Amino acid sequence: MLTKYHYIYHGNKIQIDMKEKKNERRAFLGKMALGLSSVVALPFLFSSKTKDEDNMEEVHPVKKIKALGFQWETADPFLFCVHHEDKYPKGNDAMGPDASLEGRSLGQDFIIKDGWRMYHGGTVPGFPGHPHRGFETITVVREGIVDHADSTGASGRYGNGDVQWMTAGKGVQHSEMFPLVSKEKENPMELFQIWLNLPKKSKMVEPHFAMLWNDTIPVIEEKDLDGKLSATIEIIAGTLKEENAPAPPPDSWANEKVNHVGIFNIKLEANSTFELEASVEGVNRTIYYYEGNDLKIQDLDIPFYHAAEVDPTKNLVIKNGDTVSKILVLQGMPIAEPVVQHGPFVMNTREEIQQAFEDYHATQYGGWPWEKYDMVHAREKKRFAKHADGMVELKEG
């Protein structure tokens, strides 16, 4: 999934237009509540105390607070995260919006209008076939449906709590379309797409994807002293509170436990308190506050739609205000290698990026075996995954 590069479709080939698209929403959000700065200056970082007094006082575990834009900044080993939330209307016969598309920049529709966007889609919202190399995409669908197709011949439909974890490796084309399967009611969509880097040793592995179906993802429900629900924690990657997420793909940086990669989605009930347990020294840990109106980490106010970089070695007490709040936690040991990204490719050197483009234009990373780039499956199709080796997974609903 990409947000700032143009794709021009010519038969069974795609031309990548590297002209960047100005993201007005990101520019706006980047200034929201912060004036001209995107980083909150924490008061305790500018103390007038003496050196001896400073040595006696514990440093606050929140290192930095940053505003969130359309693409959320992340720390190594992650590359970035995008939070898509669209209130799609009823679907039409083609599983596109049963609404006028007039006034939209079809093919590059990233401005919210009437509560939703078409993205790169022309008929159905989503992201028609496009290439990747050198990293992984982790697509966490909170609500709605995603149809997958790729250049290996694999395909799938997933949603409503499912997660697709795709290793692009040496190169793959894939499409991610958002079919509006209901003609009788609205089709709301919410998902995160997280880009996780691959180390140099794994950048040219065979493409692969794994499905983490919603019934395999551990969910912890915590209650307060009165027995009332206080927090719901989904463990998408890694380990938290002695619960382990499903295994990631075999070549993932997350597959080695010593890398402590974690992806945790946490819902906090009104007026609740939650303790996020410590990880280990060296891990990069960031908390993304994406829903709610009042949140404190160790008694420090965190503005809505901001991220807090925190000390991974500290247990953190998170206090919620009088409405439901939601946070996403990303953590992991850094890969600590050079990162060179150009469009859909992430490698270690400029020469490798150039080679990625040359290989793509020569091979199309296996070509596109589907009848169209904005491939969607039949409306009545249930959730499924068909892998490149022919294995099929079928799910109800």
Regions found by a protein language model. Give the residues of each.
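N-terminal, Lys/Arg-enriched amphipathic/low-complexity engagement segments
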Residues: 57-140
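Conserved metal-binding segment of the jelly-roll/cupin
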Residues: 158-173, 303-314
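C-terminal segment of N-terminal export signals and the immediately downstream linker at the start
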Residues: 16-17, 22, 42-63, 376-379
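C-terminal flanking tails of non-heme Fe-dependent oxygenases
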Residues: 305-307, 311-319, 324-397
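N-terminal export signals
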Residues: 27-47
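N-terminal secretory signal peptides
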Residues: 1-27
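Glycine- and acidic-residue-biased ligand/ion/polar-headgroup-sensing regions
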Residues: 133-149, 153, 162, 169-170, ...
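Ligand-binding loop in jelly-roll beta-barrel domains
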Residues: 169-201, 312-341
